[in-house]
Regions:
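Membrane-integral, polyisoprenol-dependent glycosyltransferases
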Residues: 1-351, 495, 534-542
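Membrane-embedded architecture of ER/inner-membrane glycosylation machinery
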Residues: 2-12, 16, 167-187, 194-195, ...
Length: 550
């Protein structure tokens, strides 16, 4: 008995895990897709236009897209993107890539907060499991690597989760994260989702697991921090831009649900359930496994995760927007619950996840490598023909740097999947490594091919190349002009970013008009079509240059 040591005071058993490998993989996961491509629809052209307006003196409180307020773009995202542009462009990255660093920044912050939440709530080693599960979610890829305000929402939700996780031991830090997360969420996702999560925090003490003094103090501190911060933006907007404040209050203050004068709901639960299957895999099967192994009310983290998921699911069910990225509202608590019983995952289930990941990403990697040779060297011929069909503007381009990245990622993945004694955590690690490999190959080997298909630059360049030199000179000298409709934002943004000709907005005096219409649409009476074009295989979007008949 004299040598007895209480279990809590014993040193943790030594493990052979290497946390630096996790950091290396997350670092590798963060960067593919950030560099070396144009602005891709649907969000990037609009976000970058608002960013340019901010850098040229537009209001920092409201995203300005061609003179119109766009409250879907969080101002804090534009501030961060502008800071990265000032810091990195043009010496370290082009303007587009530098702006995308904002998404990387918020995503990295979100992953870090979720990792700490897992460590605080679940214990040693579980923090990295939460991060690996999130890195394996395909739904997180676009908002993490492209210009998207959803990365701010992810960071805010992760801060809130981390704040909850610290309530039992670090009241001040927990209150700062919880209150700061609420404030950041109100800026990015509106006040309805924020209010629902605040209400969830207030109702948690109804359960005995959350009925302790430190949590009450954390809540008091969170309100002391969060409420003043949440009021700052509406107050400044009301004082400095009253008209914009009224528009925001009535149409966007509640986020996707509209505003006080335009509140909307719709039943879209089937849409979100259908998309959750691929968006949040492997979080949902791992979460389901956890629920079969525990009593929901027995653990603090299970009560929190269940309450959060239930509240967010109700909002998603009545969300009027059918936009899959809103499922990010569920990712942090689902990843937490998925990691809770990961080490207890049965060998058969772990082996299946591992096998499914190896087959899926292995075949995808082989296809991407074969596709790379097909599009650049013409072999296999049938695949080369299909590649040219879907991206006819692509010109074979082999850049040594992306090739080196692709060549590095492939053997690293092969090394990762050859480990023996696969258990739950190793299976999730291999899945995340497979997602990283597939994304890296897609954003290196296929990047020029994708850019030629998704960017408007080839279309704009085709139009300008089709103009007679004399006519182009008349446009440059101001003797002729091209008019474009003020409401045609897509055309205006595309020609501003990639064209050299000036467009006049709603100028009836111009003899030429640039319009957006499907290809092979007949010109209106009194006009002659002198050019038409569209991105490859796009049957809805098209552009045409019309000349007024004499």
């Amino acid at each position: 008995m004299l040598t007895y040591t209480p279990p809590d005071s014993r040193k943790p058993a030594k493990t052979y895990e290497k946390p630096w490998l996790l950091l290396l993989m997350v670092f590798a996961w963060l960067w593919p897709g950030v560099f070396s491509h144009d602005l891709w629809n649907p969000a990037e052209p609009v976000v970058f236009t608002a960013l340019e307006a901010l850098r040229h003196g537009a209001s920092p409180l409201v995203a300005d897209v061609l003179g119109q307020a766009d409250f879907k773009i969080p101002p804090v995202y534009l501030w961060t993107a502008a800071a990265f542009q000032n810091l990195l462009s043009p010496w370290a990255a082009d303007a587009y890539s530098a702006a995308r660093f904002a998404s990387v920044f918020f995503t990295a912050a979100g992953l870090a907060c979720c990792g700490f939440a897992g460590f605080n709530l679940l214990g040693r080693h579980h923090g990295r499991s939460v991060v690996l599960i999130l890195a394996g979610c395909v739904g997180l890829l676009s908002m993490a690597h492209f210009l998207s305000g959803l990365s701010v929402t992810f960071a805010a939700l992760s801060m809130i989760l981390c704040g909850f996780s610290l309530a039992h031991k670090k009241v001040i830090t927990g209150a700062l994260l919880l209150g700061g997360g609420w404030a950041l969420l109100s800026l990015s996702a509106g006040f309805l989702l924020t209010a629902v999560l605040v209400l969830t925090a207030l109702l948690l003490p109804l359960h005995p697991q959350w009925r302790f003094k430190r949590y009450a103090l954390t809540l008091v501190g969170a309100f002391a921090v969060g409420l003043p911060l949440m009021v700052v933006y509406p107050f400044l907007l009301h004082r400095l831009q009253p008209a914009a404040f009224d528009l925001w209050l009535n149409t966007r203050s509640l986020g996707a649900f509209g505003g006080l004068a335009d509140f909307q709901t719709a039943f879209n639960l089937p849409y979100y359930l259908k998309n959750l299957i691929w968006f949040a895999f492997p979080t949902w099967p791992l979460m389901a496994w956890t629920y079969t192994r525990i009593r929901i009310g027995a653990q603090r983290w299970s009560v929190l995760g269940t309450a959060w998921i239930g509240a967010a699911a109700v909002l998603l069910a009545v969300n009027p927007e059918t936009y899959q990225d809103h499922l990010v509202w569920l990712l942090p608590p689902m990843a937490l619950l998925g990691a809770a019983q990961l080490d207890g995952l049965r060998r058969g289930a772990a082996a299946f996840i591992n096998w499914f990941g190896i087959m899926t990403f292995g075949f995808l990697a082989v296809f991407l490598w074969i596709g790379f040779f097909a599009m650049n060297y013409g072999w296999p011929a049938k695949l080369a023909e299909r590649a040219a069909y879907f991206s006819p503007y692509y010109v074979p381009d082999i850049d040594p740097a992306p090739m080196a990245v692709a060549l590095l990622f492939t053997p690293l993945w092969l090394w990762a999947i050859t480990r023996k004694n696969i258990r739950g955590r190793q299976a999730v690690t291999n899945w995340a490594a497979g997602v990283t490999l597939a994304w890296a190959l897609l954003m290196t080997l296929f990047l020029p091919w994708l850019d030629a298909a998704k960017s408007h630059a080839p279309v704009v360049q085709q139009m300008e190349a089709a103009l007679a030199p004399e006519l182009k000179q008349r446009f440059s000298d101001g003797l002729e002009c091209i008019s474009v409709a003020a409401a045609d934002h897509r055309t205006r943004i595309a020609w501003t970013q990639y064209g050299s000709l000036k467009l006049n907005v709603d100028d009836a005096a111009c003899r030429y008009r640039l319009v957006q219409q499907p290809k092979n649409t007949a010109p209106p009476q009194g006009w002659t079509q002198i050019w038409q074009g569209a991105r490859p295989r796009n049957k809805v979007e098209g552009f045409a240059l019309l000349e007024k008949a004499e």
